Amino acid sequence: MTNESPNSSAQPAFRSASISAIVPARNEEGAIAACVESLALQPEIAEILVVNDQSTDKTAEIVRGLMLKILRLRLLETQEVPPGWVGKNNAVYLGAKEAKGPWLLFTDADAELQPGAAARALQIAQETGAALVSFSPEQITQSWYEKALIPFVYSRLAKHFSYEAVNNSASPAAAANGQFLMMQRDAYNSIGGHASVASDVLEDVALAKRAKAAGFRLWFGPGQGIVRVRMYRSFGAMWQGWKKNLYLLVGGTPGAVLREMESAIPWIPVALILLGLKIPVAS
């Protein structure tokens, strides 16, 4: 890797529009416009596929309005979720099947790409030979509970998912962040795409593990200046989001959570209580 700024432009050969961006969206009327508009500002993105996952708000209506001015924007609709599938995985798999580009960029409806983000991702792929490039987004925090808990949670996750280890082909460590996960189409198809991780709640990490196990190079790094996300806009949403994911992220067993608590700063139990994280115990 070079020491260039994260926003530096990719070499001319990689600046052609070669990326299909895929955005699963369920009830994202407050965020979808900013996300789509940020994708539309990336010259390297040839098409934007928003997959409306049975929204009951104005998400689809907003996207249809944006289609009038963003000609490379398409709206897809999911049907019933097949048995054994997580809803989001079904949505992104539908988008991937419809996409035409040699690179697939999976991002979330609450993510906003910064200028030069797609070019930087392609540049990293070119320089490192990575078939999967992922950034851990810059987290936007506004409320007191976001400012208190989001940095804490991400500091703990950094302990488990070392960028250096993930990017080392000799290490079995693998991770990615689904808020910005770009993958070469051929590599994606060869490991079975999201169909191979259909039931995984942490589909981004599962996909990275499958890619690395198959011999593909990964690149994972910080996303400051690349992509920004405000994950939760209410305490209730944060409660539901992290209690679903945090248990799995730290190891998926009661013992792993206890070890995490032992090694963390003293107020981690408070954070777990605030998030409503329940550790299963044998009955």
Residue map of PLM features:
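Alpha-helical bilayer-embedded segments of polytopic membrane proteins, i.e.
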Residues: 1, 249-283
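Cell-envelope/extracellular polymer assembly enzymes that use nucleotide-activated donors
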Residues: 17-20, 47
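Acidic helix N-cap motif at the loop->helix transition within catalytic regions
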Residues: 30-34, 57-66, 75-77, 116
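Short, acidic, metal-binding catalytic loop of nucleotide-sugar glycosyltransferases
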Residues: 37-46
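A conserved acidic beta->alpha catalytic loop
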Residues: 38, 52-62, 80, 111
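Acidic donor-binding/catalytic loop of UDP-sugar-dependent glycosyltransferases
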Residues: 58, 109-124
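Long helical/loop segments within the catalytic core of UDP-sugar-dependent glycosyltransferases
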Residues: 74-95, 120, 124-182, 186-190, ...
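Catalytic donor/gating beta->alpha subdomain of glycosyltransferases that bind UDP-sugars
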Residues: 125, 131-158, 189, 194-256
